[in-house]
Every structure is written in C-alpha cells, then in structure tokens.
C-alpha cells in the first residue's frame, strides 16, 4: 500500500500529510468518487495525531444525544464566542458547528473509526456561558492493529505516556478513572494488565498491546479505512512546493526515492501536514522567547512549516503566528521527544513554582493557559519562569504519577534509571536543600509551601482558586477532602522536575475561509488550495475550548474541504475570509 506506483502522476485530490485531519479529508474525497493520493514526508504515517490523545471536541454530537445529553447549536456558539472573543471568526465558527456533528456521524457510520462520548469530561472554560460539564469530547475506542497487516510497521508508535506501563492500551475514560483513583480503579488496572498478559500469541510478536488506543487508534482505524478504499499513501515523500496554472494551484512538487516528481491535482490540494514547531528558525521569528523546537512534544524532523512557506510564497495570508497549542513538557533522556504534562498538574500535593519559589498560576489550568502564564510571568520576573519547577513530596511520589515517573508504590526510586537523577528529577531530604539543587530561592519556596499547606486544610486556594471548578476537579483525587486538587507537602524526601514551555503544535498558519480554502490578504481564495489542522490558523483563535479542540476542527475542516472540492464550486466573493490581526 505504501509502495510508490509512479505510473500515475495525476489525481483529483492530493493530500499533504497523514494525520487525522489529512486522512479524514482523503476518506471523504474518495467516498465521493474522487481519486486521491496522500503524501507523507516521514517513514511513518499518523503525524502528531498518532501520539496524541485522539479526542475530538464535537458539540451536539449524536453520541451525547443518545445517552440523553443536552446540547444545542445556540449553546455551543455562545460558548465558542465567549472563548474565542475578538480572535474568533463567526463565519468559520458557524461552519465548524454546522459540520462537526455530521462529520463524525458519517465517519463512524461509513468507516472503521469508532468513538464513545466522554460524558464527564468538562469543557476547558467551565466559567464561560454555554460551557458543559461533559459530553462534547469524544474518546476513540480501541482498535485491533492486526487489521493493518503490512501497514502496521509503518504506523507511528504512540507516546509512552499514552500507554499504561508504557505498553498497554487504554481509553481516555479508563485513564481518567485510574488517575482520579475513582471507585474500582485498581480492578480496572488488573483487568487491563490481564488482557495484555493473556494475549500470548501477540506478545510473541511485540511488547506492545495488540490494541491501539487514543490517537494511535484513530490513525490506525483511518488508515485501515483508506486501505479498504485503495487510497495510496506515499511515505518518505517530501513536499517541495506547489504547482501553479496561472493563479490556481494545480499540483505539488515532491522529492522521493532520489527523484523530483511533479504530481498534478485536477480538483485541489489539501495541506494537512502540521505546523512549524519543529523549525527553530520559524519559532524564533514568530513565537514568544525563549523557545526551543526540542521543547515540543511533537515528532522531531516533522512539522517544519513547508506548507506555510509554500503558501506565503504565493501570497497567502496568515494569522495567530505568535501562538501555539501550548503544553508544559519534561525532557526524558533517550526518548526522541519530551513528554507533555497534562493531567498530573491537577493531582493534590504538587505545586509549580518559578525561580523565586513562587506560584504564578493555577496548576490545574488547561495546558494552553498554563504555558501562556509561564511566558507572562517570565516577562514579569525577568526570566525566572521558563523553565518552571514542579515540586512534590514523598507522599505524592508514592501515590501519583508525574511525567515519566510512575507512582513509587509501582516503580520505586531504586528501580528508576540512574541517569534520570538530576536530569529528569531532583531529590533532597528538605525543601531548602532541594531549592539549592535547582537554583530556586529557598525562602520563597518555603513560604509558598507553608501557604499551600494552609490552603489544603481549608480547601480554598486564595491565590489561584485551584480546584475551584469542574475542569480542575476532573483529574483531582476524589478521595482527598475538602479539595481533590490540594494536599499538603510535608513528607520527605522532596522532589522537583523541570517544566519547559513546550507545545503539541503551533496554532498559527495559513488563513482559511469557511470552506477551508487558503485565502490572500484581501480575503479572496487561492483557487485549488485548502489547508486544515495546524497548517491553518486555528478556528479557535487563541483559545482551547475543550479536549480535542485541535483534532476536532482538523477532521471537520478536512470533511468540509473534501465536500467543497467534490461540489466543484468555484471561488466567489462570498468565500472571503475575515483576516485576523
């Protein structure tokens, strides 16, 4: 399937990239009778989607309605307008709301992709009008990877942080139950491990679970669905530039197998190849400083902004270039990329401080806002918040995970890799000694911990209201009272881990209209060119409305792009986009 049949050099649609949005667009284009080619620069397919949680934020979805959930287009738009503010384009937002629910219904009805509703996963901004305490995020079901046959080795491996014990598949719903230590969590872990251990035939082939979960499940099920449709996917095929016929994009130039090929696209080219987070030059040009490509939790060598630069060269407009899908990350020696720190920041008994030993943000806040606060505080303190430090005590270490550290009751310090000490984590018998090790103000840290310990007793964080809303509490420990996100730091030894200002992709990119067409500075579409996912400026503006706020729009606008191409509608003035500053 991934062998290059170069006897065909002309297709109706060419898709650049192989993440969830790219493959979704290819699938819907193929289902409307169009010939489709996918090209991928890497030797693996799946992109950042494959290492992600795979969740998609889909308001008014049929899964939620089926269990009696209450949502509406009006409520969803109220929330999105409040979340995106001046950075939101009402026309694009309306297009998203109009097409997201139909997209996932058609996809799950006509492919191997399977989702379930995360009915207790809240929107990220529960304080805003129109927010729901659950039901808009969908979680991929497990997928049997043996169905991929010869394409299995080409699937990008999931991040170790998305697997139980680094090898066992579980859904986001299972992971939440275990992390929140909800009733029955230990029995759940036992069942998952038993299922894995008893699959003797598969374990003789691989140490990884037969089943894919999260983003790996989404990508695997999409790839199998494309195999069912005989849609070719060329790996090791580097996008070089677009081909033009007048002002119309009519194909692409690629490098593969030591050759430069010109591939014609009769109906359209869809950019779905990710952002520019792995391009240090572009990071330094556009993003807040300091910034490092090595801090990004996305695969190194990919997402270097080739589509962005090609679009700029033909007059495309851009927006939101100084924003990313921020997420704090922890570097782990021997791993190709750092790990994002998501749920752990809400666990009780850990705090995050700057170099002054002071807290500067609600640790349980959404990850985009968390890193944004790192940069804001870094500016205020003269460079003392990038990096920041997560601090926890011996009780936390025994009970909870943090980044690559499993709870010590499962993996004690004696079983950790020796090279991790003073690189991944720092350890000392007292807070003062720990502060000196990591270069944090000792008095500042001691005072901060004393204050947090008082807050843990009362259950009220007077500084940042940690645990004060349903989103914070989602990953809190339900057994901890009165606040599931607050516990004292008292029991030595004490630990620290460095948090970098990382990301899971860039947010800015080529500006598009409601049809996913790339537009020029005057808002007019560039004929034949579409962009989705992190190639494009996010429809969500500078907000992150809920889990799956990246993949949901990527897949939805992939669906929109495929439909627009299939319809044969020509560009008109009504297709103008609002240019965001």
Where are these regions (language model features)?
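A glycine-rich dinucleotide-binding beta-alpha-beta segment and adjacent secondary-structure elements
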Residues: 241, 248, 444-539, 543
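Internal hydrophobic alpha-helix adjacent to the cofactor/substrate pocket in enzyme cavities
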Residues: 310-317, 446, 553-573
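Conserved N-terminal/central alpha/beta ligand/cofactor-binding core
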Residues: 41-232, 352, 359, 398, ...
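Glycine-rich loop(s) and the adjacent beta-strand/alpha-helix scaffold that form part
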Residues: 209-216, 228, 256-335, 339, ...
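Extreme N-terminal leader/targeting segments of oxidoreductases
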Residues: 1-13, 31, 216, 220, ...
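An anion/pyrophosphate-binding glycine-rich loop and adjacent beta-alpha core
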Residues: 126, 132-134, 141-188, 308-310, ...
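Helical element adjacent to the flavin cofactor pocket in flavoenzyme catalytic cores
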Residues: 200-266, 308
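N-terminal Rossmann-like FAD-binding beta1-loop-alpha1 element of flavoenzymes
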Residues: 13-38
């Amino acid at each position: 399937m991934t062998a290059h049949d170069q006897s065909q050099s002309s297709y109706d649609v060419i898709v650049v990239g192989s993440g969830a949005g790219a493959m979704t667009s290819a699938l819907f284009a193929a289902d409307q009778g169009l010939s489709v080619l996918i090209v991928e620069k890497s030797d693996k397919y799946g992109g950042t989607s494959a290492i992600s949680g795979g969740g998609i934020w889909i308001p008014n979805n049929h899964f939620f309605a089926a269990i009696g959930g209450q949502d509406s287009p009006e409520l969803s738009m109220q929330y999105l307008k409040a979340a995106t503010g001046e950075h939101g384009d009402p026309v694009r937002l309306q297009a998203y709301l109009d097409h997201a629910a139909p997209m996932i219904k058609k996809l799950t009805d006509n492919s191997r992709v399977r989702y379930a509703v995360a009915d207790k996963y809240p929107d990220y901004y529960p304080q805003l009008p129109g927010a729901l305490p659950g039901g808009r995020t969908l979680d991929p079901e497990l997928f049997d990877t043996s169905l991929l046959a010869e394409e299995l080795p080409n699937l990008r491996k999931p991040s170790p942080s998305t697997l139980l014990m680094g090898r066992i598949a579980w859904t986001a719903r299972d992971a939440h139950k275990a992390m929140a230590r909800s009733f029955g969590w230990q029995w759940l872990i036992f069942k998952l491990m038993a299922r894995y251990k008893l699959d003797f035939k598969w374990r003789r082939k691989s140490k990884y679970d037969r089943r894919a979960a999260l983003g790996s499940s989404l990508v695997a099920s999409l790839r199998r669905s494309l195999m069912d449709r005989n849609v070719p996917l060329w790996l090791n095929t580097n996008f070089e530039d677009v081909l033009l016929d007048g002002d119309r994009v009519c194909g692409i130039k690629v490098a593969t197998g030591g050759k430069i090929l010109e591939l014609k696209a009769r109906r359209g080219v869809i950019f779905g190849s990710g952002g520019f987070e792995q391009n240090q030059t572009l990071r330094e040009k556009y993003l807040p400083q300091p910034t490092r490509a090595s801090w990004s939790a996305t695969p190194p060598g990919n997402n270097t902004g080739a589509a962005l630069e090609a679009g700029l060269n033909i007059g495309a407009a851009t927006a939101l270039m100084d924003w990313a899908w921020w997420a704090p990350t922890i570097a782990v020696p021997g791993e190709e990329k750092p790990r994002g720190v998501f749920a752990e920041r809400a666990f009780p008994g850990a705090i995050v401080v700057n170099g002054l030993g002071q807290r500067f943000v609600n640790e349980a806040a959404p990850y985009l806002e968390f890193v944004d606060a790192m940069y804001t505080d870094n500016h205020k303190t003269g460079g003392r918040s990038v990096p920041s430090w997560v601090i926890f005590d011996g009780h936390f270490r025994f009970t909870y995970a943090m980044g690559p550290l499993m709870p010590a009751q499962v993996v004690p310090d004696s079983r950790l890799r020796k090279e991790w000490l003073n690189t991944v984590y720092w350890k000392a018998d007292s807070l003062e000694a720990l502060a000196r090790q990591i270069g944090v103000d000792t008095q500042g840290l001691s005072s901060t911990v004393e204050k947090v310990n008082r807050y843990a007793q009362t259950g009220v964080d007077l500084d940042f209201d940690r645990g004060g809303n349903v989103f914070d509490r989602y990953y809190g420990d339900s057994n901890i009272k009165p606040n599931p996100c607050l516990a004292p730091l008292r029991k030595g030894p004490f630990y620290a881990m460095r948090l970098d200002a990382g990301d899971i992709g860039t947010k800015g990119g080529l500006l598009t209209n409601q049809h996913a067409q790339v537009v020029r500075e005057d808002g007019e579409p560039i004929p034949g060119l579409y962009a989705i996912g992190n190639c494009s400026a996010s429809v969500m503006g500078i907000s992150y409305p809920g889990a799956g706020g990246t993949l949901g729009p990527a897949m939805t606008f992939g669906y929109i792009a495929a439909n627009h191409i299939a319809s044969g509608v020509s560009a008109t003035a009504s297709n103008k986009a609002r240019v965001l500053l």
